[in-house]
């Protein structure tokens, strides 16, 4: 099966966010950000756990006030996934959450303050072995850069990032990653491409403020897809005006599409037409919901007729090809004698998938339980 990605990733240095490796060939980490009030500890903890359940490697939490910093302490005690504290304006908040076991500090060069304040944050991070993300955003560039460039440009985002990279270099601090996000795809992509040529540190990817679930997913897939295909990127966040859980799902779907990193079922399904012998759309939708808990990577093709069905099944772990009343079943690219009743496809296919997952994870004896 054609599963190897042809992408050659950019060489970068290695940092750790908690126990998650970032850069230097480590799996590209998928992260999201809570949208609850951080001072609502119960709601924030619940959302973090929901994100962890769908595979989030890292979760970012906004910490806008000292009260939020105190809440962060409680949140950290009740969660397991590495947490990034998102800090703007008041550098003292960064110093406070560092005391509470934060796994990474995100600072915004556009509003964190002068070099002396950055020095205080860096010395604290060094002392406690906490990495930093320099998070440049096209919507909050420094005033002098806006005066110079008149608008956000790739060169402006790059200059903002490099100013702070230089500060960290002068302070002999190399445990950091960098992002240069923008809401415009071309602006973000060109900014990252320029930055990738300038530094060796890991890059955190994102199209900021991408939009709602549908449009934002498309915009992020286009922008991040361009960068990832170039080998650029060590961690990513899909920024959606939607449930943060969707950000994780879309992030993994993008990585899965490029064969960079797979998690769970990769459904290969036809859009359906009058040749379909069963309801493809409802079958796929139902199986996606039922199998959300599956982590093991697996390709499952669900094709409604025999035009493309057999060909797709040949390169799938499990394949289904629509037939008159009974549909053909393939396992590891081989047509099986067993056929599926078109009126009971979802239950039958779920059982086969779960059995194969169990075999892959060695939870049951290695025998053909699906023949």
UniProtKB/Swiss-Prot annotation:
**GO BP terms, alphabetized:** isopentenyl diphosphate biosynthetic process, methylerythritol 4-phosphate pathway; terpenoid biosynthetic process
InterPro entries from the UniProt entry? Dihydropteroate_synth-like_sf, IspG_bac, IspG_bac-typ, NO2/SO3_Rdtase_4Fe4S_sf
Q: Which UniProt keywords apply?
A: 4Fe-4S, Iron, Iron-sulfur, Isoprene biosynthesis, Metal-binding, Oxidoreductase
Q: Please list which residues make up the signal peptide.
A: none
Provide the E.C. number(s) assigned to this enzyme. Answer: 1.17.7.3
Name the enzyme group at the top EC level.
Answer: oxidoreductase
Q: Sorted alphabetically, which Pfam families does this protein's record hold?
A: GcpE
Q: Does the keyword Nucleotide-binding belong to this entry?
A: no
Q: Which GO terms describe its molecular function?
A: 4 iron, 4 sulfur cluster binding; 4-hydroxy-3-methylbut-2-en-1-yl diphosphate synthase activity (ferredoxin); 4-hydroxy-3-methylbut-2-enyl-diphosphate synthase activity (flavodoxin); iron ion binding
Record flagged with keyword Iron-sulfur: yes
Sites where the protein binds [4Fe-4S] cluster: 270, 273, 305, 312
User: Required co-factor?
Assistant: [4Fe-4S] cluster
Q: How is the cofactor bound?
A: Binds 1 [4Fe-4S] cluster.
- Pathway it works in: Isoprenoid biosynthesis; isopentenyl diphosphate biosynthesis via DXP pathway; isopentenyl diphosphate from 1-deoxy-D-xylulose 5-phosphate: step 5/6
Which SUPFAM superfamilies does UniProt cross-reference here?
Answer: Dihydropteroate synthetase-like, Nitrite and sulphite reductase 4Fe-4S domain-like
The catalytic activity, as recorded, is:
(2E)-4-hydroxy-3-methylbut-2-enyl diphosphate + oxidized [flavodoxin] + H2O + 2 H(+) = 2-C-methyl-D-erythritol 2,4-cyclic diphosphate + reduced [flavodoxin]
Q: Domain of life of the organism in this record? A: Bacteria
Provide the family line.
Belongs to the IspG family.
Free-text function comment from the UniProt entry: Converts 2C-methyl-D-erythritol 2,4-cyclodiphosphate (ME-2,4cPP) into 1-hydroxy-2-methyl-2-(E)-butenyl 4-diphosphate.
**Protein name (record):** 4-hydroxy-3-methylbut-2-en-1-yl diphosphate synthase (flavodoxin)
